Each structure stands twice: as structure tokens, then as C-alpha cells.
Amino acid sequence: MGDVAPEVEISQYTKDKASCTRISIESYYSKRVTQCAERENRLKKLEEDMSARGLSDDEKDEKRKIHHSKETDYLRLKRTRLTVNDFESLKVIGRGAFGEVRLVQKHDTGHIYAMKILRKSEMVEKEQTAHVRAERDILSEADCDWVVKMYYSFQDYSNLYLVMEFLPGGDMMTLLIKKDTLTEEATQFYVAEAALAIQFIHNLGFIHRDIKPDNLLLDARGHVKLSDFGLCTGLKKFHRTDHYRNWPVTLPPDFISKPFESKRKAETWKRNRRAYAYSTVGTPDYIAPEVFQPNGYTKSCDWWSLGVIMYEMLIGYPPFCSELPQETYRKVINWQQTLVFPSDVPISIEAKATIKRFCCEAERRLGNHGGLDEIKQCPFFRRIDWNHIRERPPPIRVTVKSIDDTSNFDDFPDEDLSWPTSTLIRPEEQPGRRGEFVDFTYKRFDGLTQKMRYSDLKKQAKKNKKGQGSSD
């Protein structure tokens, strides 16, 4: 017998590279099939639209030529490598545990976007790669007025970038902090729009799992759009059951009887609210009790969260709020005892009944069996024109002076607007070297057809300002 060749030990780096290559190849061919189907669907949609409008053959030919030109431009765009140098950083409009959000302008088109910048090292270390991957995948799949649009996603050695439509109206959290409470009419409107957004996500086959005011964004007219889809995977650490496993669930004897005037409670909540929004720990205020349990949960957990938001709109703070997340958790688990309505903030019987139907056992919950159709039958929403709600003016007017107006966002003064440096890292030390961020790049087709140009509008605004100054 001949000598047996010694086994060659394969390094972890080589194994990671092989795994990454396999993922890349699978992703490449899967994407080619998807892109072909999307291209056919766009042409089919164009043909249906032209037939519905009764266009002549010559007009149809002209439309087809324009469409073909757009498809060619899109292919060219897809081959172009995007970097942060393609954008001008205008202002920081948000900050979180893993990065920040900036208002940016794309150099070649002048379009305005909100760019989310996430540090790869933080995402890997905090086990958040599934979070950002879920958000990227769902935003690329969703194409609806109820969901914030993502136009581009790309990466460099150090960071991930999600380039989304900028919604100048801010978010529901900011609106609720500004207002003590909302009227029942306003609450009906915003809860109805949020319900339509949630139903759209459910129709895609996803559970959002993180419905809260921070994730209900407002467009320039004040209509709701849903954002932040990372928890659709159910993998975010502080929303997993094991994070709360060692927390006590029983209430102390005087827990409910402690007097706490509503105004003072609302002030305390508002004071702590923003800190919770920017922390890695978060708050369990809006999470359904079954999410904490080992028996699992269904899409009805999103309807519970909507009920909590409805309570906050009418009362001024969520029903289970406490100074410590541990206390909030105990209140949520013991909701049968802690879901109470303060006597000093009166609301209608219908409103109270609707909240109780949202915040109850999962099997009895409003929306659990019939989804949006079941919610539409609720007496509290009888004045809502569900089919035309997005065409109606919102009950609270959003003031937006220009497409780059950030007055509805928090101020982050004296921030460094230079782009994060992306230093070259040895391949074996790169975050995501095992393929976590393979195929992260995305470019949206209708990004080619946006109309607004930031530079032109700014020039016009300056001209108008000069004209007004000379006439005074």
C-alpha cells in the first residue's frame, strides 16, 4: 500500500470564503430569475394601462419606446457601483444604537433621500445582521403607498447604507410628544391608516412585530407610512423571550393601587420616551404578552400593538408605561389587572371598547380572525372612508416648507457631516466575512422616474426670497 496523503487542515477563513462564494452564486441566479419576472411585469402593467386609457397605436408605440429606454437606463444603473461619494450629506435627522440617519442629496439627480448608515461591526457583534437583512429584503419587495420606499442599498468595508424616501412629516412619536392627546376623530384616522399598512404587511406573509409610534412615519401631507421591518424575522435580541426570562412576572400587592395622576404620568413618559427610542434596550410597552411566552404568537400581535398606540393617542401615554422596562414587562404580562382607564381623561365608550378588543387574549383579539375586514366593522371606525382615506386631508396639518425641511425631526446640532471613513481591513478581519452581507446591493426601478430636483427648487426658493426682500 502507498503512503496515505496527510489531511490538509482548511482554515476558517477559507471555509468562510467558500461559504460566501456559494451564497453569492445562489443569489446571482435567483436574482436573475426575479429580475426577468419584474421586467415582464412592468411591461405587462404598461400594456394594461395603455389599453385602459384607450391610446392610439402611435401613442402606444411612443410609450413603449420611452419604457424601453428606461429599462436600458435601469440596466446601466444596476451596473454602476454606488458609494457615499455619490451623495451630499445635508443633516443628521436621527440616531440609534447601531448608526444614524442623514438627509442626503444625490449628486447626479438632485433627489433628496433619508440615508440610514449602520456599522457592520456593531451589527455582527450585537447579532443584528438578520435585522438589517430582513429590512432590506422586505423594503425591496414592498411597493405600496403604506410602506416607506427604499431606492438603494449598498455597502463598503465598514458600513451598510439604506437609501430611502425622505418623509418630511416626521413620525407619530414626535407628533404624540408635541400633543398632549389626540381627538377621537384624529385617532380614528391614524389608527385606520396604520391598520391598512399592517394589513399590507400581513398580506405579504410577514408579521411586523415592532409596531410603535416611532415606526409610523408621516409624509409631506401627513399620511402614515410604515417603516423598520427588521423584527419581521423575530430575531432582535431584546424582543426575544430569553431576554426577559429572568425578570419577575408577579405584581407587588400595591402595584395597581399606587396613585399616579394622568398628567404627571404623561409628563414622565414623554421625558423618558426619546431615550428609549435611541437605546439598544428599548421598551416593551407595545409588545403583545404572547410574544414573551414560549408558546409562540401569530400576526395578531401586531393588532395588540395598534391597540396600545390607540390608548396612547387618547390618554397621553401607553397603558403599561413605567419608569423601568422591567415594571412595564410585568404590567404587560399581567394586562388583565393593569389595563385600566384613568377617570381624569374621559374617552367614549366606543373608543374604550375598541382598545379592549385590540388588547385582549390573542384568540379573541380584533383582527385575529378577519384581519382588516373585521376591524372595518368596528363601530369606532364607522365614519372612516376606507377606500379613499389616503385622498382625504389628515386631521392634523403637517407643515413642510420645502422638500429638505427637517423641522419635524429632532435637532442634532454641531454634528460632523463628513462621511464615515472606510479604512481598508484585512479580508479575514472584515465584518460579515462569512457572507452575512452578500447581495446587499439594491436599486429601485422607479428611482429613475422621480420628479423633484433639490438644486432647482433651492435656486427658485432663493430667487423668491430675494424678490420678497426687494418689495418690502
Curated annotation (Swiss-Prot):
The active site is at D210 (proton acceptor). This is Serine/threonine-protein kinase sax-1. The gene is sax-1. PROSITE patterns: AGC_KINASE_CTER, PROTEIN_KINASE_ATP, PROTEIN_KINASE_DOM, PROTEIN_KINASE_ST. Keywords: ATP-binding, Cytoplasm, Developmental protein, Kinase, Magnesium, Metal-binding, Neurogenesis, Nucleotide-binding, Nucleus, Phosphoprotein, Serine/threonine-protein kinase, Transferase. It comes from Caenorhabditis briggsae. ATP binds at I93, G94, R95, G96, A97, F98, G99, E100, V101, K116. Residues 87-381 form the Protein kinase domain. The lineage of its organism: Eukaryota, Metazoa, Ecdysozoa, Nematoda, Chromadorea. It is found in: Cytoplasm; Nucleus. Disulfide bonds: none annotated. Acts with sax-2 to restrict the growth of both primary and secondary neurites. Regulates mechanosensory tiling by controlling the termination point of sensory dendrites. GO terms for cellular component: cytoplasm; nucleus.
